[in-house]
Regions:
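Conserved helicase motor core of SF1/SF2 NTP-dependent helicases
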Residues: 1-94, 98-183
Length: 183
């Protein structure tokens, strides 16, 4: 939904660019180790979710996709390299934010300049950083009236919002049951 919203904001606004940000935390217990290549080649596997959504919404053969990519209007960056940046005229999608620390999220949101929107997406059930995630705390911090008045919105999906598949809806329901019984 965030990529869809970002692409909608980009359409008809040539001054805006899309920046995809995520962490290089792996979801498996055992990492692959160092990846060969330059920064772009190393980060490319982490861009798979963005590429999947772009393919779904803007197939390879569409002029829109080719134009956005060739003009450099879609780019990606790991959270590690944000310090010092200032974003104007950007639509930022921060994905897998449950794997960002509070400090990393602070770095992310303090890059906001003029005409910038940030979508911070995450699922606290899927954190891979063992209690170090700042995602839930950041959500709580900005889920108030003052933030809403400034245009900061918080939205949490639940099981009824799942569209991927019926089996996934069942799986999430069972995981939530298990989580409630443990707590």
């Amino acid at each position: 939904m965030s990529v869809y919203s970002a692409l909608r904001l980009l359409s008809g606004k040539p001054e805006l660019d899309l920046l995809y940000v995520r962490t290089v935390i792996e979801s498996a217990d055992k990492g692959l180790g160092a990846l060969p290549g330059d920064l772009e080649e190393k980060f490319n596997p982490y861009m798979a979710p963005l590429n999947d959504k772009l393919e779904e919404m803007l197939p390879h053969n569409t002029t829109d996709r080719q134009t956005l990519l060739s003009e450099g209007r879609i780019s990606a960056m790991p959270i590690n390299f944000l310090r010092g940046a200032s974003w104007n005229d950007k639509v930022v999608v921060a994905d897998e934010a449950q794997n960002f620390t509070f400090k990393e999220l602070t770095t992310l949101i303090t890059r906001i300049g003029q005409n910038t929107k940030i979508f911070i997406c995450g699922d606290s059930m899927q954190s891979d950083i063992n209690g170090k995630s700042g995602f839930s705390d950041m959500c709580k911090l900005f889920n108030d009236y003052k933030s809403k008045q400034k245009g900061i919105e918080y939205f949490e999906f639940d099981e009824s919002d799942i569209k991927r598949s019926a089996i996934l809806k069942f799986i999430v329901s069972k995981l939530n049951e298990g989580r409630k019984s443990v707590n």
